[in-house]
A protein has these predicted regions:
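Nucleotide-activated sugar donor-binding and catalytic core shared by glycosyltransferases
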Residues: 1-137
Length: 137
């Protein structure tokens, strides 16, 4: 565990095994350095934070049990790019973090999820135009 008061994301220290971030606006820059990413909020009634930000970098996405309101988390679990753990799962998490082959496969699956979402904006805009903006003759 490395403690560092970061001024900028480039201050991530080589060889650090755990990085805990309590700052706004830097996570998207830091995910690339990880083997796996624990997404916060999974033990909180409001649920998890953004899982796609980590998946974009092809990282294994891990989170607590309160993810069911978040479709992307559910879909990533189904593809094998994510895993959900409860309070008693520390040994299982530790085992996964040592299994670099499994982490790599999960990261590939997370990246696959991101690729499957390509074109979503175009599909949504087309739907809105057809449903609400097109004129009938």
């Amino acid at each position: 565990l490395c403690y560092n008061q970061m001024g900028v994301p480039s201050s991530v220290l080589p060889g650090s095994r755990v990085l805990i971030v309590d700052s706004f606006g830097v996570l998207a820059y830091l995910y690339r350095y990880a083997d796996a990413v624990w997404i916060g909020g999974g033990f909180n009634p409001s649920g998890i934070h953004n899982t796609v930000e980590a998946a974009v970098y092809g990282k294994a996405v891990l989170f607590g049990p309160r993810y069911k309101r978040f479709r992307e988390a559910y879909d990533m679990l189904a593809l094998g790019g994510a895993a959900s753990y409860g309070e008693g799962d520390a040994a299982a998490i530790a085992a996964l973090l040592k299994d670099h082959k499994a982490l790599s496969a999960m990261g590939d699956s997370a990246l696959e999820y991101v690729a499957l979402q390509a074109g979503a904006t175009e599909r949504i805009v087309s739907y809105i135009v057809l449903k609400y903006l097109s004129t009938s003759a």
